[in-house]
Amino acid sequence: MAQNLKDLAGRLPSGPRGMGTALKLLLGAGAVAYGVRESVFTVEGGHRAIFFNRIGGVQQDTILAEGLHFRIPWFQYPIIYDIRARPRKISSPTGSKDLQMVNISLRVLSRPNAQELPSMYQRLGLDYEERVLPSIVNEVLKSVVAKFNASQLITQRAQVSLLIRRELTERAKDFSLILDDVAITELSFSREYTAAVEAKQVAQQEAQRAQFLVEKAKQEQRQKIVQAEGEAEAAKMLGEALSKNPGYIKLRKIRAAQNISKTIATSQNRIYLTADNLVLNLQDESFTRGSDSLIKGKK
């Protein structure tokens, strides 16, 4: 390139006339390069552009998509918008239906409506988020929260969030904004109300505990009554069995001896037992007399 310029300079006539011609050529080339540079611009991905011309203002019918575009230098210049969704956290103190102070924070995912960029620029400019979002969020929050009591804001949080999102989305359309997502990120109350809620929860837990103890005592009382009735019925049945069959006591004694022998057999110690040790003295006269006297007493 430098060699070409030298060759071009060598061909030009020397003297003042030659210098003037060279200067004109350089100025012409510079003007062409500047014109080409100023006539071309690029719209990046996720952006849109509109034209503003110095005679008619914003061109309402021109919205430029991504890519390379041309303009008339000085007469037109592009205004580029980022149309990608951007998150923003907005906090607002407000009051509930029962006059409790509520601090609520929202995460709003918003983007401009690409089809309405010319009118948005005329009304709001490029800093539309700062002009619109805080005001409409505060407006909607105060309107929705005032419909619920403080306790309902906790128990019906999903419904509150849905109502806020619905009303805020409709309100944002008036300003050419699209809300992709609205979510409650924080919900807090005053210290006094929080302390009152905690005290109420403690009282409810104590009441539930007291009720549990009462029910437990009633259950134990019913269990004892059933047990006593069962023992009385068992005693009655035992008396009837003895009166009908005097040998029933001997049978019970044999079963008791069997249980004793099984327990001792599984023990590691070795013990030698007699019939007396196993309560098997069934032929003992004292045992027979005791059984007979018991049967006579039942009669």
Curated annotation (Swiss-Prot):
Organism whose genome encodes this protein: Rattus norvegicus (Rat)
Localization annotation: Mitochondrion inner membrane; Cytoplasm; Nucleus; Cell membrane
Family per similarity comment: Belongs to the prohibitin family.
Protein's GO biological process: antiviral innate immune response; B cell activation; cell migration; cellular response to hypoxia; cellular response to retinoic acid; estrogen receptor signaling pathway; mammary gland alveolus development; mammary gland branching involved in thelarche
Main localization (coarse): mitochondrion
Gene Ontology MF term list: amide binding; identical protein binding; protein heterodimerization activity; protein homodimerization activity; sphingolipid binding
Modified residues (Phosphotyrosine): 128
Subunit record text: The mitochondrial prohibitin complex consists of two subunits (PHB1 and PHB2), assembled into a membrane-associated ring-shaped supercomplex of approximately 1 mDa. Interacts with ESR1, HDAC1 and HDAC5. Interacts with ZNF703. Interacts with STOML2. Interacts with ARFGEF3. Interacts with SPHK2. Interacts with COX4I1; the interaction associates PHB2 with COX. Interacts with MAP1LC3B (membrane-bound form LC3-II); the interaction is direct and upon mitochondrial depolarization and proteasome-dependent outer membrane rupture. Interacts with IGFBP6 (via C-terminal domain). Interacts with CLPB.
Pfam families xrefs: Band_7
Name this protein carries in UniProt: Prohibitin-2
PTM-bearing positions, type N-acetylalanine: 2
Phosphoserine PTM positions: 151
In-chain residues carrying the UniProt-annotated modification N6-acetyllysine: 147, 200, 236, 250, 262
Region (Necessary for transcriptional repression) residue spans: 19-49, 150-174
Entries under InterPro entries matching the protein: Band_7 (IPR001107), Band_7/SPFH_dom_sf (IPR036013), Prohibitin (IPR000163)
Record remark on domains: LC3-interaction region (LIR) is required for interaction with MAP1LC3B/LC3-II and for Parkin-mediated mitophagy.
PTM notes: Phosphorylated. Tyrosine phosphorylation is indirectly stimulated by IGFBP6.
SMART domains listed in its UniProt record: PHB
GO CC terms, sorted: axon; cell periphery; cell surface; cytoplasm; GABA-ergic synapse; glutamatergic synapse; inner mitochondrial membrane protein complex; mitochondrial inner membrane
UniProt keywords, alphabetically: Acetylation, Cell membrane, Coiled coil, Cytoplasm, Membrane, Mitochondrion, Mitochondrion inner membrane, Nucleus, Phosphoprotein, Receptor, Repressor, Transcription, Transcription regulation
Coiled coil location: 190-238
Function as written in the Swiss-Prot or TrEMBL entry: Protein with pleiotropic attributes mediated in a cell-compartment- and tissue-specific manner, which include the plasma membrane-associated cell signaling functions, mitochondrial chaperone, and transcriptional co-regulator of transcription factors and sex steroid hormones in the nucleus. In the mitochondria, together with PHB, forms large ring complexes (prohibitin complexes) in the inner mitochondrial membrane (IMM) and functions as a chaperone protein that stabilizes mitochondrial respiratory enzymes and maintains mitochondrial integrity in the IMM, which is required for mitochondrial morphogenesis, neuronal survival, and normal lifespan. The prohibitin complex, with DNAJC19, regulates cardiolipin remodeling and the protein turnover of OMA1 in a cardiolipin-binding manner. Also regulates cytochrome-c oxidase assembly (COX) and mitochondrial respiration.
